[in-house]
Amino acid sequence: MVLKHSVTYNLSFFISFTFSSIFFSSLILFLVYKSVLSKLFFIKYLMLNLTKVGLRRFWSQSPRRNAPKKELSSLLESTITPKAFSKRTEEPNPIMQGTDTIPMPFYLHAKCLKNNTHITLCSPERKIIFRASGGTCGFRKGKRRGYDAAYTICSKVLEQIQVKRLGIENLHVIFHGFSQAREAVQNCLLGQEGAVIRDKIVKVMDRTPIKFGGPRGRRERRI
């Protein structure tokens, strides 16, 4: 009977001790958490106050804030007519003084093929004014190829330019292809026939297409 009472007493003491230890430990943890949280809130509050004070001091000492306010009309005038633009428009360009607008160029296309030559004169709008080839100049079949036929074709085109009085001021010469006809056209422009238009030539271009790979070409034409 005495043993039974001692066991119950020890059990109740153990239970009460565990509950009290849990209570006190939780209380200590709560107090620690509360103190840490209060310190964090204090640090956050201090940082916010410091940043507010710093921003106020910065804005109070900034030159842009203390600068006098400009009117809207003056701002619009400065944006619409800047000094650099007004200076550029006021000062005349010495290169362009005494010169009119540059007229649009005419185009002379010389397609120099192996068996024929095509020369076309185009307006600044790229419309055909006159064209000539071996057939229009009276050459037939194999006679359309060669130096003489190309020279005759070019001289006929230059003659038509002189007859029609087109008033060409600028001329672009564009070559297509490599053959004897190309040399003939060049010599005709540099010769007596091209004296009328030679001073008007401002640009010479070569637009010969160059083939890189691709499919097999057509068979060679035989006349």
From Swiss-Prot:
Stretch forming the transit peptide: 1-38
Transmembrane segments: none
GO molecular-function terms, A-Z: structural constituent of ribosome
Keyword Ribosomal protein: yes
Chief location: mitochondrion
InterPro entries: Ribosomal_uS11, Ribosomal_uS11_sf
A single Gene Ontology CC term: mitochondrial small ribosomal subunit
Domain of life: Eukaryota
Subcellular location: Mitochondrion
Keywords: Mitochondrion, Ribonucleoprotein, Ribosomal protein, Transit peptide
Subunit structure as annotated in this protein's UniProt entry: Component of the mitochondrial small ribosomal subunit (mt-SSU). Mature yeast 74S mitochondrial ribosomes consist of a small (37S) and a large (54S) subunit. The 37S small subunit contains a 15S ribosomal RNA (15S mt-rRNA) and at least 32 different proteins. The 54S large subunit contains a 21S rRNA (21S mt-rRNA) and at least 45 different proteins.
PANTHER family in the record: 40S RIBOSOMAL PROTEIN S14/30S RIBOSOMAL PROTEIN S11
Function: Component of the mitochondrial ribosome (mitoribosome), a dedicated translation machinery responsible for the synthesis of mitochondrial genome-encoded proteins, including at least some of the essential transmembrane subunits of the mitochondrial respiratory chain. The mitoribosomes are attached to the mitochondrial inner membrane and translation products are cotranslationally integrated into the membrane.
Protein name: Small ribosomal subunit protein uS11m
Organism per entry: Schizosaccharomyces pombe (strain 972 / ATCC 24843)
Gene it is expressed from: mrps18
